[in-house]
């Protein structure tokens, strides 16, 4: 028969069992317990599919023969008792059988084995007849055919299968050996694909019904019931495993789960970008373009419509709605962003923070002025983060603690005090005051409206007041919003002759601090804070001084500006350049790099920018902030500044 790994465990026990049974030294009690124990282990192994049905049938048959040879029978056998070593049983022992209990009754087994009562030594034939045992033992148990009887193959019936007898087995005569068992005790033909192509046994396929198969596989052949003696209980077959059932909750498949997980990650990233009112870059367009085409009808995610297609650019520089980016700005590319009404997640106005977008049209405001503000004064530049502002570490920390945190988390404010709604940045020109205002809008996820005080003052008192009121109304209509008014001192002339915008400005500032202006932050910048009167100064709850950049900040600004020109300086050259630009503002450092690029292009040769070009430009560009002005700014900060 074919070898399978499931034979390993039972066959490892055969040499020990054979030696114990055939030896004359063990006690009769030990020989009494050995065959039933082996039979129980065989039952257990077969019931748990550790061995095949063919192996179980062979082992059980041998155990039955051994057990019949061990028991003591009342009827004497034919002939005298042999003294050979292979004869065993109670009658082969010189001492009586000392069993604690009477012999195990197996009347039905004896009836099925007629030769068991005729010869008490027939048990060894079942053990020695296994070719597996003969192959496992180091020496053959029986050599040759010394007994002189006929071979086992001629003595047994054809259906028994003489191939299971060892070639060296000492066969006996018909009178001494037990007759072959009936066909009902033998194993049926193995299932298809197992063992030889032709079946060794031919038995009727009777037995219990086949169990349902697993999935689409055909069920295995069921072993018939009559292959065991009637006295041995057949092991209970294990139930076949149930076919797979779908999940009760309908979970998606593996591929769908991966896509859902990726979708959740994308939504999480989108939620993080929603906080700052911009999103990551879109997927490539269907036509193969690197980025999707920009929509000319909408501006950067803030709900305000851009200028009409045929509008001119006259008002851009006039009102400060857009212009060339400063050197401290973020990279030139800005991803396309969704309309602002997609991101209404704000703290309710009842807590004093930013309110939900109202969507109601402004009342009492000129529609033409509101359209002008929505088209030309909304900043559409890229978002600015804290890292885009070089230096100013103490100022950033103060803004986070005193302004951003109360606005974004109003319940954390002590008492019933409302968070600040106005902030003033003052300092020398070109120090990044407007850049800080843009950064606040990004941190708050708010719409940014930019107004230039000089442009409003130049448009006249009536037109300037109309535009100023329209800007505040537009900010209130679409909160959260940040209204950035640069050059605030231009709106407050030294002489109040009725043509200034002081009164409309104070009125709008008072309205921005009331309950109607929830979600609006007003940011004013000036380089001459001393020009502000006391009434205007008190309208700004927070006042911060933006100083000139220090050495580390100047090095960072120079590296960014020169990298845009394709120039990379080594550490020594950069340190020398930082030392030579002491007292420069961020704007002046940007002008220095532009002048160096112009110096490199004068020669007409396409060569990269070098340190010599920067040195040549440094001789032409110098610091413009006098020390007297810097001292006055420091004094004003000590008197009226919020301190940081």
Curated annotation (Swiss-Prot):
Binding site for ATP: 390, 430-435
Polar residues composition bias: residue spans: 10-27
Region (Disordered): 1-36, 285-323
EC numbers on record: 3.6.4.-
Subcellular location: Cytoplasm, Cell cortex
GO molecular function, one term: ATP hydrolysis activity
Taxonomy of the source species: Eukaryota, Metazoa, Chordata, Craniata, Vertebrata
BP-aspect Gene Ontology terms: microtubule severing; morphogenesis of a branching structure; negative regulation of axon regeneration; negative regulation of cell migration; negative regulation of wound healing, spreading of epidermal cells
Cellular component, GO annotation: cell cortex; cell leading edge
Broad enzyme group: hydrolase
InterPro entries: AAA+_ATPase, ATPase_AAA_core, MT-severing_AAA_ATPase, P-loop_NTPase
Phenotype on disruption: Knockout of Fignl2 in cultured adult dorsal root ganglion (DRG) neurons results in significantly longer axons and attenuated effects of inhibitory environmental cues on growth cone advancement. Neurons show high rations of tyrosinated tubulin and low rations of acetylated tubulin in the distal neurite region and an increase in the average ratio of dynamic to total MTs in the distal most segment of DRG neurites.
Pfam family, one: AAA
Residue spans of biased composition, Low complexity class: 285-294
Family recorded in the similarity comment: Belongs to the AAA ATPase family.
UniProt keyword terms in alphabetical order: ATP-binding, Cytoplasm, Hydrolase, Nucleotide-binding
Source species: Mus musculus
SUPFAM superfamilies registered for this protein in UniProt: P-loop containing nucleoside triphosphate hydrolases
Requisite cofactors: Mg(2+)
Stated role: Microtubule-severing enzyme that negatively regulates cell migration and wound healing. In migrating cells, targets dynamic microtubules (MTs) at the leading edge and severs them, thereby suppressing motility. Microtubule severing releases ARHGEF2 which activates RHOA, which in turn regulates focal ahesion turnover via focal adhesion kinase, as opposed to F-actin polymerization, to suppress cell motility. Negative regulator of axon regeneration that suppresses axonal growth by selectively severing dynamic MTs in the distal axon shaft and growth cone.
Protein name: Fidgetin-like protein 2
Catalytic reaction list: ATP + H2O = ADP + phosphate + H(+)
């Amino acid at each position: 028969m074919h070898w399978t790994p499931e034979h390993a465990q039972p066959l490892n026990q055969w040499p020990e069992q054979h030696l114990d049974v055939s030896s004359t030294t063990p006690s009769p009690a030990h020989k009494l317990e050995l065959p039933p124990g082996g039979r129980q282990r065989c039952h257990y192994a077969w019931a748990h599919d550790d061995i095949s049905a063919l192996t179980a049938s062979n082992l059980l048959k041998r155990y039955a023969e051994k057990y019949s040879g061990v028991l003591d029978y009342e009827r004497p056998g034919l002939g005298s008792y042999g003294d050979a070593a292979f004869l065993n049983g109670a009658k082969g022992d010189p001492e009586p059988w000392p069993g604690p209990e009477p012999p195990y009754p197996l009347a039905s087994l004896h009836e099925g084995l007629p030769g068991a009562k005729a010869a008490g030594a027939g048990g060894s034939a079942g053990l020695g007849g296994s070719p597996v045992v003969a192959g496992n033992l180091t020496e053959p148990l029986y050599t040759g055919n010394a007994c002189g009887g006929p071979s086992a193959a001629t003595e047994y019936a054809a259906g028994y299968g003489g191939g299971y007898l060892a070639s060296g087995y000492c066969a006996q005569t018909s009178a001494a050996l037990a007759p072959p068992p009936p066909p009902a005790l033998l194993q049926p033909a193995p299932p298809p694909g197992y063992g030889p192509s032709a079946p060794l046994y031919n038995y009727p396929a009777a037995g219990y019904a086949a169990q349902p198969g697993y999935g689409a596989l055909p069920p295995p052949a069921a072993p018939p019931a009559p292959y065991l003696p009637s006295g041995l209980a057949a092991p209970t077959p294990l139930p076949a495993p149930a076919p797979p059932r779908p999940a009760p909750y309908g979970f998606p498949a593996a591929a769908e789960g991966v896509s859902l997980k990726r979708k959740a990650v994308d939504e999480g990233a989108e939620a993080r970008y929603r906080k700052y009112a911009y999103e990551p870059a879109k997927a490539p367009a269907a036509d193969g373009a690197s980025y999707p085409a920009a929509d000319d009808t909408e501006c950067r995610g803030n709900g305000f419509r851009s200028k009409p297609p045929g509008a001119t650019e006259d008002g851009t520089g006039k009102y400060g709605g857009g212009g060339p980016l400063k050197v401290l700005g973020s990279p030139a590319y800005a991803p396309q962003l969704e309309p602002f009404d997609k991101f209404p997640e704000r703290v309710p106005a009842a807590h004093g923070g930013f309110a939900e977008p109202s969507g109601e049209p402004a009342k009492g405001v000129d529609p033409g002025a509101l359209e002008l503000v929505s088209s030309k004064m909304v900043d559409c530049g890229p978002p600015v983060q804290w890292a885009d502002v070089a230096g100013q570490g103490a100022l950033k920390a103060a803004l986070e603690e005193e302004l951003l945190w109360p606005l974004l988390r109003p319940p954390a404010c002590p008492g019933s005090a409302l968070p600040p709604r106005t902030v003033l940045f003052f300092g020398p020109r070109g120090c990044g005051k407007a850049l800080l205002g843009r950064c606040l809008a990004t941190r708050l996820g708010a719409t940014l409206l930019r107004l230039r005080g000089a442009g409003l003052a130049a448009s006249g008192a009536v037109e300037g007041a109309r535009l100023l009121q329209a800007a505040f109304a537009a900010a209130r209509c679409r909160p959260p919003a940040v209204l950035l008014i640069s050059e605030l001192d231009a709106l407050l002339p030294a002489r109040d002759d009725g043509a200034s915008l002081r009164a409309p400005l104070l009125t709008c500032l008072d309205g921005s601090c009331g309950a109607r202006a929830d979600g609006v932050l007003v940011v004013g910048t000036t380089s001459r804070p001393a020009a502000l009167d006391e009434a205007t100064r008190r309208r700004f709850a927070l006042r911060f001084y933006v100083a000139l950049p220090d050495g580390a900040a100047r090095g960072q600004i120079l590296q960014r500006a020169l990298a845009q020109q394709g120039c990379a300086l080594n550490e020594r050259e950069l340190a020398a350049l930082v030392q030579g630009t002491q007292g420069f503002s961020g704007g002046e450092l940007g002008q220095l790099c532009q002048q160096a690029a112009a110096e490199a292009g004068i020669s007409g040769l396409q060569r990269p920018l070098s340190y010599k070009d920067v040195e040549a430009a440094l001789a032409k560009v110098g610091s413009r902030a006098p020390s007297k002005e810097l001292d006055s700014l420091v004094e004003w900060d000590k008197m009226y500044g919020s301190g940081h």
